[in-house]
């Protein structure tokens, strides 16, 4: 009996860690089924102009920041992240049901986006819970986080091609219903498998160190990550419409490009997690900026299908390092506040969507989808300035 109990105890951490990986994959799938086709959905199903498409992304980001910041503050001070993640998954499923059958732009913008914001917040909360679990069990936080990020990338290998196949072959309702089922399954696994870690009040200065000591570096990192995510947002908004309307390439190519980049991100994330102790997060983030500059320059110069696919290696390096190392960089600068640090990093994505939504819509309306990539190059130059001024930690 004693031997059996000991063996079970040894297996439990592995089961829990595996559950984190599976749930990270499912939350990634839920997002990867919706985001790649959103601009196409708004322009063809809801039938709005490019400016309104950009406005939708901007409004979505603003609401998302408010929701995630409120939940992050609550989760860092009290409550149980497990319950919060479960509730977010169920609200995400409700959002998918609304998108499946409603075609009123403003209903989608306000009610749909509010529900979706809760759904998307499940992901940063999952990573915050994983960080706490890794710290408690003695696992390497950097490598464990990189493996979880790799699950997100794996979901994006599968999600975008499936999303375009469902949307173009069976209609957008089928695509959104599939995403709703994934959210429900994710919530079920959270309820059954994730550990509960209720908050306890700890007043140790070592564990609750104020991030104000690193205010300058946190601000520089926030600015750099925001600019980098803005470029990615412009790419994700413009790219499907750019391929179809300006390059006259097949719609499904967008899904293939996204899936290819996501597949290449997996080894990039794992390698970055392995190298972080040797090279440091700052150097890796600088490499990401350089890869991004070359990638967006290539987008402005090349227009063949195979050339665009080949460029995805640079895109994978850019996003793979940013997604994996950026969050850990914030957590290092804000010790004892895993939820706030993780959500602050997530909010760089959302602020990026605010900027990219506005820019992508206006630039496409006034000039072209192609011009958005030129603006991305200038933004990456600004991100490079920030990354070359920030200190290593």
UniProtKB/Swiss-Prot annotation:
Coiled coil: none
GO cellular component terms given for this protein: plasma membrane
Induction data: Activated by cyclic AMP receptor protein (CRP).
Keywords: Cell inner membrane, Cell membrane, Membrane, Sugar transport, Transmembrane, Transmembrane helix, Transport
Gene Ontology terms for molecular function: carbohydrate:proton symporter activity
PROSITE patterns (alphabetical): MFS
UniProt topology in membrane: Multi-pass membrane protein
InterPro entries attached to this UniProt entry: MFS, MFS_dom, MFS_trans_sf, Sugar_efflux
Domain of life, source organism: Bacteria
Main location: membrane
Subcellular location: Cell inner membrane
GO biological process, any: cellular response to glucose-phosphate stress
Family the entry assigns: Belongs to the major facilitator superfamily. Set transporter family.
Function: Involved in the efflux of sugars. The physiological role may be the reduction of the intracellular concentration of toxic sugars or sugar metabolites. Transports IPTG, lactose and arabinose.
PANTHER family, sorted: SUGAR EFFLUX TRANSPORTER A-RELATED
UniProt protein name: Sugar efflux transporter A
Native species: Dickeya chrysanthemi
Source taxonomy: Bacteria, Pseudomonadati, Pseudomonadota, Gammaproteobacteria, Enterobacterales
Encoding gene per record: sotA
